Amino acid sequence: MAIKAEEISALLRSQIENYESEMSVTDVGTVLQIGDGIALIHGLNDCMAGELVEFSNGVLGLAQNLEESNVGVVILGPYTEITEGDEVRRTGRIMEVPVGEELIGRVVNPLGQPIDGQGPINTTKTRPVEQKATGVMARKSVDEPLQTGIKAIDALVPIGRGQRELIIGDRQTGKTTIGIDTILNQKGLDTICIYVAIGQKDSTVRANVEKLRQAGALDYTIVVSASASEPSPLLYIAPYSGVTMGEEFMFNGKHVLIVYDDLTKQAAAYRELSLLLRRPPGREAYPGDVFYLHSRLLERAAKLNDDLGGGSITALPIIETQAGDISAYVPTNVISITDGQIFLQSDLFFSGVRPAINAGQSVSRVGGSAQIKAMKKVAGTLRLDLASYRELESFAQFGSDLDEFTARKLERGKRTVEVLKQDQNKPLPVENQVLIIYALTKGYLDDIPVEDITRFEDELNSWTKSNGSDLLNEIRETGGLPSDDKFEATINEFKKSFSKSE
């Protein structure tokens, strides 16, 4: 068979014409220095701030410091296998986490990877971790209540959907308990909850997850955990990952509650990173942008206007103080960013007043407009009564001969303190709260011994399930306060069957 030269040349020509050379240019650098979760990279000249870079062992890092010839990178994972001279590549991507309904009921790390041993999360949707907060015109003022189920909060420092309410206090004063109880109270209220555990012991996180699971709250909750054993970059990222997951639901018209437990540890992790990156330290050795660290996080909590679906993110950041000092750097920063604070006091906690809320220093700047009418009416004078009781109590210690008015006020004050006490993990529906606070403020508890108040309330709640359900239903469905006659009939009917202790 003869081979023609023309055929060969035509074949070669067509091959050459169809040849496509795909050149891929990758920006590659080398590790100059590595340690404590920080790497100094040389050669990534076009790297962007906040860009993800990939080390040769597959671990990702986040570009933070862009210097003249080097890039400071925080490593998002184990860094012990990375050595000097290793290759580092740009990815051209910014950090994103998986979002969506598939995350509900799962425990994930700040990168969105499951750590609960229940298999992979089947979602392809992701959102950037660093996102600009919702603009002014996209928001609307807080007008819907978010019930915590805690009498002292719903009556004295009410929280609305879209609000940022700080929970602040020393260690071991019940801060986490308030966050967990609020999550438990959202059962059946069509709210997605996100619990972000930052720098806590693994055993503590496990105990809290079990609490949520036993109460059936894990069915509407996502847990994001960056425990104390994780590298500090993950502790720094964790709150942003949590709020990113929440934004997906908010922009779809849903209501979200997010608890950051706690932001003091996030600030400490960020201080550690900044000092290792050789950024200049400021007050208490924190970097200059520690205010922005928290403001850009908490500003992402919002109530969207109706055109955007009316969704909301309500944030409950937790801050731990040292010896009750709320004038330290991070506490004052976060107090100035949030819409109010719940101040928990060690003295109250150890004297048996739990939740240990200091009514004088706790405030809600926007929640009052979201309180239901019934609660607003019955709890109107409660804060004042409590403040005057605390004042009289300190005077009464010095003298025994008190006039009748003062003695009566002291007795009412003791009962007020008892009514506002509440066991942990037992949130109370708002209609039951209105009933007991009405009974207190209208004097129905004045003839009940102080030691019987808790038992009186428990038995009243049990009794009304079968006998006073009409009254409770009216409060629940209308939000208004039923007539005094209805309250009087219900409370007096119950008091007939209540036996006081001798």
UniProtKB/Swiss-Prot annotation:
Which protein, by its recorded name, is this?
Answer: ATP synthase subunit alpha
Which HAMAP family does its entry note?
A: ATP_synth_alpha_bact
Q: Which family does it belong to?
A: Belongs to the ATPase alpha/beta chains family.
Q: Where are the transmembrane segments?
A: none
The record ties this protein, via PANTHER family, to: ATP SYNTHASE SUBUNIT ALPHA, MITOCHONDRIAL
The places in or outside the cell where this protein is found are: Cell membrane
The encoding gene: atpA
Q: Which InterPro entries match?
A: ATP_synth_asu-like_sf, ATP_synth_asu_C, ATP_synth_asu_C_sf, ATP_synth_F1_a_nt-bd_dom, ATP_synth_F1_asu, ATPase_a/bsu_AS, ATPase_F1/V1/A1_a/bsu_N, ATPase_F1/V1/A1_a/bsu_N_sf
Keyword ATP-binding carried by entry: yes
Instruction: Alphabetically list the UniProt keywords.
Output: ATP synthesis, ATP-binding, Cell membrane, CF(1), Hydrogen ion transport, Ion transport, Membrane, Nucleotide-binding, Translocase, Transport
Q: Which PROSITE patterns match?
A: ATPASE_ALPHA_BETA
Query: Where in the chain is the site Required for activity?
Result: 362
Q: Which domain of life is it from?
A: Bacteria
Q: Which SUPFAM superfamilies match?
A: C-terminal domain of alpha and beta subunits of F1 ATP synthase, N-terminal domain of alpha and beta subunits of F1 ATP synthase, P-loop containing nucleoside triphosphate hydrolases
NCBIfam families, alphabetized: atpA, PRK13343.1
Kindly state the subunit structure of this protein: F-type ATPases have 2 components, CF(1) - the catalytic core - and CF(0) - the membrane proton channel. CF(1) has five subunits: alpha(3), beta(3), gamma(1), delta(1), epsilon(1). CF(0) has three main subunits: a(1), b(2) and c(9-12). The alpha and beta chains form an alternating ring which encloses part of the gamma chain. CF(1) is attached to CF(0) by a central stalk formed by the gamma and epsilon chains, while a peripheral stalk is formed by the delta and b chains.
Q: Where is this region: Disordered?
A: 115-134
- EC number in record: 7.1.2.2
User: To which species is this protein native?
Assistant: Staphylococcus haemolyticus (strain JCSC1435)
